[in-house]
């Protein structure tokens, strides 16, 4: 099992990926403890001195002007969690819940939230024991933080709601008992600290980024395979072309194509002296289009990594000055915009792949049998597989509509502008699944096209990509039930079968 020492504010993208993919045993670095304790002491001083501070001894949202008596402060925090656990939709899977919890721990342990070390350790204990709160996927607008999802997470700490332990949904109290854990009672400020934050939005978008990286790499490999299958030129990947423009993403993608294609191959030599002057854009402009997508992936990584290590609570406790200051770090606009931009990249990766599939269907453009099968007419070959790819590409165009420009006021207009970051992040998963299906069809089609160049082979890496598929999916000599082959190729892509052929590009 993955073991990780968490130094607050220093999570790396690879650590976050590991948390998403695998259960983790988490330990808090000792350097965080003094800051955590100092912030709690500051909150206690405010309560003891009778000062009014939002979220500590007031109501919330539009009720912020309501002063709460000291004897009601614990009940205030518990009531906050219970009332805000109002999410709907399917439960998030264990991987997403685990990522949200680790992000929440990372933020709280920065020492600006006024939450006791014992509560943070209780969250860590949930992660380590594999107790995963039931968090519905929908119900947050991404400001004031991800209130509903994080309230559902926090319910389990209180022994309320449901949680999954060892694959079984149980009452939270039962799950805690089976894992050898106890519920906690929240003190002043702690319920708000748990609920306020962008951790669900950030986790949603991070999953989108992780999937987009796999899709990007797979699409580059399939684009190179298609280039060989239709006797495309290597000349558009010449480094001098891309250096002249100076777009770094484009330069790097062209380098990836040169790595995959190598200088030549038996296929390339077979048409070295052909009379074709230029390839269609879906081949020739791959570095330009995929380079723009890579730039978006890199920018998204920068924003999400900053947010993963951020303090997005409100109010914030500045213990060194003895102050609690209200602000707006809970507003997930950076995450929403990053997710929206990533959606454009995922849509374009799929759209370009679909155009290459269509190119292979056209015998005049590809110089291959119509629909990549012999005895056409009796056999329809890849005809409808390309239609499926077109349907998925079209869906993605609608899903790529930006969410960050869509705001609805909430909390009686106190919270009058929101980010919609959770929806922006969550839809990335559907887009990624669509794009993976498109790339799977291209992989099948490109390998079939190369097979039809009988006796000719591609570069070593591309032959490896073809062999990986052929170990699971046979060449098409005649029509057969097609859907299982797409499912098989899709599963291989999700396992990183093509991604591992591509050097690191992030």
Curated annotation (Swiss-Prot):
Q: What post-translational changes are documented for it?
A: Contains an active site 4-methylidene-imidazol-5-one (MIO), which is formed autocatalytically by cyclization and dehydration of residues Ala-Ser-Gly.
User: What Pfam families does UniProt report for this protein, alphabetically?
Assistant: Lyase_aromatic
Organism domain of life:
Bacteria
PANTHER family in alphabetical order: HISTIDINE AMMONIA-LYASE
- Which reaction equation describes what this protein catalyses? L-histidine = trans-urocanate + NH4(+)
> Which pathway, per its entry?
Amino-acid degradation; L-histidine degradation into L-glutamate; N-formimidoyl-L-glutamate from L-histidine: step 1/3
Quote the subcellular location field of this record: Cytoplasm
Q: Name one GO biological process term.
A: L-histidine catabolic process to glutamate and formamide
Question: Which family is it part of?
Answer: Belongs to the PAL/histidase family.
Organism expressing this protein natively = Salmonella gallinarum (strain 287/91 / NCTC 13346)
Signal peptide per UniProt: none
Q: Where is this cross-link: 5-imidazolinone (Ala-Gly)?
A: 143-145
- PTM sites of type 2,3-didehydroalanine (Ser): 144
Q: Which GO terms describe its cellular component?
A: cytoplasm
**EC?**
4.3.1.3
This protein's name? Histidine ammonia-lyase
Please indicate if the UniProt record lists Disulfide bond as a keyword: no
Q: Name one GO molecular function term.
A: histidine ammonia-lyase activity
